[in-house]
Amino acid sequence: VDQLVGQYMAHLCGLGYLGDKKNIQTTMKSIMKYNFVEDFSRHFNNMRSYVMGDEAGLLMASWPKGRLEVPFPYFSEVMTGFEYCAAVGMLYEGMEEDALTCINAIRRRHDGAKRNPFSESECGHHYARSMASWSAIIALSEFQYSGVDKSMKITDRPGNYFWSNGYSWGTVQVTEDDVTIEVING
């Protein structure tokens, strides 16, 4: 699920593609096809269970052609930080529906009734890897900021977007005809 984490970071940093775009898109589609499970009721996991019963999630690993004799630890688990990275990778590859399916599965698991919505525990409560969720905001808004060029870039897709650059933050409203930037602080 995390084999393209370098590409994920390259996109977030505005570096573009590290490899062939077609191969990266194929890999993201394969991750969704083979690793996303709609219902874990019949899924065996001998390690920790961060997903149970009729919940959905993105497995750490899958073997469509047969499992390794000695797989790596945690292969049959889901972990929100890895799921968010994969989902954001899907956003960058134009797979918005699949990405939001993954993100919604996480949010449904952490709905406040079954699990704490403010502590997506992986290796303990408040584990930092789940902060990767914030990168979905950057991917959906196509936000890029350069302190060197003193420039900010945002999508032309109509909507309201959050932005921040380390010095200030606010919102951007994009319409068919206009872009309105509001600085809330900074």
Task: Give residue spans per PLM region.
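Extended glycan-interaction surfaces of carbohydrate-active proteins
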Residues: 1-79, 111-113
